[in-house]
């Protein structure tokens, strides 16, 4: 008799529990973003051998970032005054595409942990 009543109270308590507040957004740019990605994604587990030196794991992360073109957003937008070979229209198009990049968005408006998990390689 007590067990069903206890189970009902537990179910009622979990149903009445207030919803979780939205995840906090953190603005992450440059090396702060890379370090957070390593922490969130579990960087050391990426390497085939846990005995790999730290430099090798860092190199692996940087290679992965380059493959995903995420480092592009970590670098400042190209200034047409610095590179006269770039047409003005191409430069504007490049800035617009960078604004939609998830890494660039993390730097400008912030990312949640869920956003960062979407950037993980696995």
Swiss-Prot record:
State the protein's name: Insulin-like 3
For the keyword Translocase, the answer is: no
Classification via PROSITE patterns? INSULIN (PS00262)
Give the GO terms filed under biological process for this record: in utero embryonic development; male gonad development; regulation of male gonad development
Q: Which residues form the signal peptide?
A: 1-15
* Annotated function: Seems to play a role in testicular function. May be a trophic hormone with a role in testicular descent in fetal life. Is a ligand for LGR8 receptor.
Which source organism does the UniProt entry give?
A: Mus musculus (Mouse)
What keywords is this UniProt entry annotated with?
Cleavage on pair of basic residues, Disulfide bond, Hormone, Secreted, Signal
Q: Which GO terms describe its molecular function?
A: hormone activity
Q: Which SUPFAM superfamilies does the protein's record reference?
A: Insulin-like
- What are the leading ranks of the lineage? Eukaryota, Metazoa, Chordata, Craniata, Vertebrata
Q: Offer a single GO CC term for the protein.
A: extracellular region
Q: Which cysteines are joined by disulfide bonds?
A: 29-107, 41-120, 106-111
Q: How does this polypeptide assemble, per the annotation? A: Heterodimer of a B chain and an A chain linked by two disulfide bonds.
